[in-house]
């Protein structure tokens, strides 16, 4: 009779080895640490490339305009890995939607906050995890996530309502200046007879400058930030951005460390998002407004309407 006892012994050894290898906490932690290190290295590379020339800088701003809720770091990572991305989700989320990632597609590496922890000095911090995402263009979905063209008048009304100060029409602005915030008057002066594009482009920039002025920041110190934020706002609102010129942008970041660069980009993102949020609230309030008004009539009404500052004052007095 053949003896098959050795099969059980071998099998037992194999199962034990498999069990031992099923999860090794130290190996897993080391792997995750390496993933984070690689992701941060990728982020620094993406940051440097974004400000390397005017084209890559514009690409970054365009991505940030599409992904307004994403951090600067993640917008930089998206711009570096797939600057045409429009809608991202991880593999499981796409699967839950009944959508499948196409074979051979490379994931887009992003960063997400992890668990809260306490540092040695007692302060609170958050760990960072690596997230693998896929754009809709990498799936079998036929859905189009491109931005819809908004109603121009509705958007302009919302922008006008978002101003933190008075808006006054004038024909006395010098040269080709379309709008100008004057701190002494706490007002934005805008040229009469402008078309929708010129109103939005110039007014959005001056609104950002006016917002900075409330915090004591001069025009000279925020003009570039306001210019870039205006580009993002134009992109989000469907206005042409072909006239924006970023040829001098790389010089502003020359010799700067990646972290410093991201700090400057944070100001651009936050400035654009502040105006976007104010516009969104204004649109919600104006859902039932008549859309047949002339653009310059909107400016006249804006002059007569209470500003955000006056509304806050009225709210305080009403309490």
Language-model segments: residues:
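N-terminal accessory/interface modules of nucleic-acid-binding and processing proteins
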Residues: 1-318
């Amino acid at each position: 009779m053949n003896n098959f006892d050795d099969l059980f012994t071998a099998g037992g050894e194999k199962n034990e080895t498999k069990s031992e290898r099923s999860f090794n906490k130290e190996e897993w932690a080391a792997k995750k640490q390496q993933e984070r290190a690689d992701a941060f290295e990728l982020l620094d590379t993406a940051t440097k490339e974004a400000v390397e020339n005017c084209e890559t800088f514009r690409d970054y701003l365009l991505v940030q305009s599409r992904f307004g809720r994403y951090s600067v770091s993640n917008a930089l990572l998206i711009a570096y890995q797939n600057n045409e991305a429009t809608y991202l989700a991880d593999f499981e989320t796409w699967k839950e939607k009944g959508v499948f990632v196409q074979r051979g597609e490379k994931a887009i590496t992003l960063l997400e906050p992890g668990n809260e922890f306490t540092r040695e000095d007692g302060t609170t911090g958050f760990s960072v995890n690596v997230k693998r995402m896929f754009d809709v263009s990498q799936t079998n979905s036929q859905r189009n996530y491109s931005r819809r063209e908004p109603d121009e008048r509705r958007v302009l009304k919302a922008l006008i309502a978002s101003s933190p100060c008075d808006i006054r029409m004038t024909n006395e602005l010098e040269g080709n200046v379309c709008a100008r915030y004057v701190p002494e008057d706490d007002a934005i002066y805008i040229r009469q007879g402008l078309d929708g594009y010129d109103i939005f482009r110039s007014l959005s920039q001056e609104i950002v400058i006016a917002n900075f002025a409330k915090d004591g920041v001069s025009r000279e110190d925020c003009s570039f930030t306001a210019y870039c934020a205006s580009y993002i706002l134009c992109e989000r609102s469907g206005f042409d951005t072909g006239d924006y010129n970023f040829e001098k942008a790389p010089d502003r970041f020359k010799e700067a460390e990646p972290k410093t660069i991201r700090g400057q980009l944070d100001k651009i993102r936050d400035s654009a998002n502040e105006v976007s949020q104010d516009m969104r609230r204004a649109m919600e309030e104006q859902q039932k407004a008549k859309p047949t008004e002339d653009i310059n009539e909107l400016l006249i009404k804006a002059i007569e309407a209470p500003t955000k500052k006056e509304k806050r004052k009225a709210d305080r007095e009403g309490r």
